[in-house]
Amino acid sequence: EHSIFYLAKKDVRSVKITLENKYLENKVDFGNMLRFYKNKVEYINSYIKQTPKKVYLFGAHLFSQNLIYSGLDTLKIVCILDNDLNKQKKRLYGTKFIVRSPKILINDSNALVILNAGIYNDEIEKDIIENINN
């Protein structure tokens, strides 16, 4: 599953609902998610450590914040890239990074872009390759 969303609506009628206790199942899922991000960050950090290129992190959103707070080596990261004009020239909440347009990559053959945008990865990668690095 991609995401879980809840919609709550106030109802004046009182109906007693008993929810199934899913604590143990949810605890396992949460532990798996933490391990997933830990492993992903270790993998990305190995690339960051050995690259001489300028490093950029794509996406001024929770995906990037998760990587950063899971131990991403941010010393070589120049800035956060995002297509959203409303996010550009602002700081990514909870970080020191300013958000810039991916167009700063034009004519930069010495860049490594970390892309961790879930189901949007293919679309973003295609846009960078076809419209920025052409």
Locate the predicted segments by residue.
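Hydrophobic, well-ordered beta-alpha structural blocks that scaffold small-molecule cofactor pockets
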Residues: S3-N134
